[in-house]
Amino acid sequence: MIVRITLALLLSASFISCVTLSAQTLPPAPSAEPQPSPGRVGFEVAAGPAFESSAAGDRTPQRAVLAVPTLTLRVGSWFDYAVEGHFARHVTPSTANEFGIVPVAFRVHTGGRTQVHLSAGAGVVWSGLAGIHGLEQRQNYITQLGAGVARVRANGSAVSLETRFYHLSNDGAKPPNLGMEQISVLVGYRLPR
């Protein structure tokens, strides 16, 4: 399942990249607003609470604090490729740390000073929650979807607010593979490009 999702994300990203690169050969259309971020490489960090949306079995839902450092590469005026870190501290009812990398991620966004975006990604996460019902091993795969808004400041930096849904599972490596689904609300800051 996760392999198919990852392949679909890779195929979508490569298709969008090809379309974007072919569109870059056309002369630029006149724009009423100046481009807020002329650079290609960016760094941002976001953090916020995460809540398990549906607990497996009869256990109490997990709550955590999530931090997401992100390195982005602007492919087009509306498309960013991203590599994200995933750091979480589960605080209740079980305490544990979680860390991982999301190397296949992208963000599609509008232009201008206020940018609405949709994001998706897939990666690998290691968790200290192994053994609770739904997560039977330490290594798990993560798939995530998000939507948010960013306000670009005059110097090119930005503040953002994003709601993100993510699913952790071992992709059937160890039954019963119920996984964990969490929703997080992230507040972020992007450095000027």
Question: Language-model segments: which ranges?
Answer:
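Transmembrane beta-strands of outer-membrane beta-barrel pores
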Residues: 47-53, 87-91, 122-128, 151, ...
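Gram-negative (and chloroplast) outer-membrane scaffold detector with strong preference
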Residues: 65-130, 190
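Residues that define the transmembrane beta-barrel architecture of outer-membrane proteins
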Residues: 39, 61-67, 95-102, 114, ...
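Predominantly the C-terminal beta-signal and adjacent terminal strand-loop region
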Residues: 148-193
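Membrane-embedded beta-strand positions of outer-membrane beta-barrel proteins
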Residues: 43-47, 81-85, 118-122, 145-147, ...
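Outer-envelope beta-barrel architecture signal
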Residues: 34-43, 77-81, 112-118, 155-159, ...
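Short glycine/proline- and aromatic-enriched beta-strand/turn motifs that initiate or cap beta-hairpins
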Residues: 18-73, 87, 180-193
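Extracellular loop and loop/strand-boundary signature of outer-membrane beta-barrel proteins
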Residues: 53-57, 89-93, 130-135, 170-176
